[in-house]
């Protein structure tokens, strides 16, 4: 599933942002420099696209560019909320806390999507199981019915 497919793309973007933000928050709290934390997080996400984007963001941060400006260039993959929270973190000096809040928000978004998907799948599975039971019932009873017809 690609990041550009209508439903799954949005889901995976939220998932990657949540994982990225949580990893960066933990690394920054652990004393890792911000640019290095961004780059490390890119290697842990499992997406070549995000790895490349985060490498470019880390390089621009190393050159002295603000993180919020670097992330705003990738608005399709990092929503405005992310850049706004990073801006607040840069202004207050609490970047790690802002990343943790972003991670919490997007983790809840992912949980909501998964919960809604499960709620949609359950009725469909019940119908499929009902059809399969009906087919099994017919497969068992039709030969018996045909046998009775032949005997008469």
For the regions a language model picked out, list residue spans one by one:
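Short capping/connector residues at structural and topological boundaries
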Residues: 10-12, 100, 147-150
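Membrane-cytosol interface motif
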Residues: 1-16
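Bilayer-spanning, highly hydrophobic alpha-helical transmembrane segments
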Residues: 108-152
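Glycine- and small-hydrophobic-enriched helix-loop-helix hairpins
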Residues: 13-120
């Amino acid at each position: 599933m690609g990041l550009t497919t209508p439903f799954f793309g949005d889901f995976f973007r939220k998932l990657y942002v949540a994982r990225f933000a949580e990893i960066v928050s933990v690394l920054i709290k652990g004393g890792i420099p911000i640019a290095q934390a961004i780059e490390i997080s890119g290697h842990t996400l499992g997406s070549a696209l995000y790895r490349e984007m985060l490498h470019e963001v880390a390089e621009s941060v190393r050159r002295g560019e603000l993180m919020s400006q670097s992330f705003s260039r990738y608005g399709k993959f990092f929503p405005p909320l992310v850049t706004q929270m990073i801006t607040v973190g840069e202004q207050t000096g609490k970047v790690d806390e802002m990343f943790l809040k972003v991670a919490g928000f997007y983790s809840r978004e992912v949980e909501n999507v998964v919960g809604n998907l499960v709620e949609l799948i359950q009725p469909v599975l019940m119908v499929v199981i009902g059809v399969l039971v009906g087919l099994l019932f017919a497969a068992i009873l039709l030969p018996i019915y045909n046998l009775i017809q032949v005997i008469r």
